[in-house]
Amino acid sequence: YNIDVFKHTLLILSEGDFGAKNLSFYKENLQIKKLEENSIIKAFFINENTYLLISIGSEIELIDKSLKNIKKFNFSHSSLNDAVLNEDKSRLVAGFESGEVELFDLKNWKMLKNYDKMHKDNIYQVDFKNNVILSCGTDRRIGVVKNEEQNFLQKDFLIYTCALSPSGEFAVYSDNEAGVSEVFSTSDFKPVKTFNNENLMSEFIIFLNNKDFIVSGFGDSIMFRSIDE
């Protein structure tokens, strides 16, 4: 489901037996722990001894190294589809089936903002870099929150995946119908570059730096792309 890294230790959320979820840790050896809750869709390090679990049931939970509950929060929304943390793991951005995007303060454990002007329907993915928020979904929109302003690009195809560069200057999304990925500026929404996905159905995009990114999808191949190529 997802992987996180903290001080050379991997945290891995994966499928267990009979639909269960496992939380595994790998540094010099592999430790596998079974989660009690099967609805977890993502897991993150907060620090070396504290982890954050994200549930499709719109709940987040802070747990300790023994997987014991520290505290919970319920967003009281429809399904939570995706969530990401900022660089210092102090804030979380979540995207919901309702089309809302929410900003949550993990240190003070409270809601900060609700962004409801960008989407009308189900959000597939969100990203959060350098105080810029990106979202994409079934309403064929790419949403951007920058300097607290909500804006969106309207397209004519479903947008399953999107990502931000570390600076938040660039965003990229994939059009699987046309088989391309397009980079645009988050300041003026002008296109920067379009890439052919070479028959890859894009599912995830990760920026390595402000110019280079990886596109992966269904299958066993990944593509390395650069805005400078």
Regions found by a protein language model. Give the residues of each.
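Hydrophobic beta-strand positions that form the internal "hydrophobic ladder"
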Residues: 10, 51-52, 92, 133, ...
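A short beta-strand motif characteristic of beta-propeller blades
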Residues: 29-35, 68-74, 110-116, 148-154, ...
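Blade-level signature of beta-propeller repeat domains, shared across WD40, Kelch, NHL, RCC1
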Residues: 201-229
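Short coil/turn segments within WD40 beta-propeller repeats
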Residues: 17-21, 57-60, 81, 98-102, ...
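Residue-level detector of Asp-centered blade-edge/turn motifs that repeat once per structural unit
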Residues: 5-7, 46-48, 87-88, 128-130, ...
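WD40/WD-repeat beta-propeller blade N-cap
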Residues: 35-40, 74-80, 116-123, 153-161, ...
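Structural recognition of the beta-propeller blade-terminating site
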Residues: 24-27, 63-64, 105, 146, ...
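Hydrophobic core register within WD40 beta-propeller blades
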Residues: 3, 43-44, 83, 126, ...
